[in-house]
């Protein structure tokens, strides 16, 4: 995907538990992750519920939410210049269902990305700024600005 016009990329995930076709979903734990790879696709680092911060890349995860009866979100901020400085080129987003509930069996589930010109603004995300749509394939961003 073409890089946004900013130095900070935010991946986000929002979901809600509840009834689907008259059945309760029960507890739903979804996990948002980002993995960084080098020019030749060697692993550089990852950000997830198992690694909330990467000091060398100035990236951070909002924290692990393990249930969403009223709705919940997770997000990851990626400093694209620091990724490049650490030898990273490609940033790949992924989502896992820790509790095994399929995404299609949730009343609401959204995932997307947005660029952030002011990462410390306190703004979480919004449809006008983000690309809030289901990914048809696993997206990755080339920090050198190439399309993928």
Could you describe each region identified by the protein language model?
Residues 1-148:
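Intrinsic-disorder/low-complexity signal
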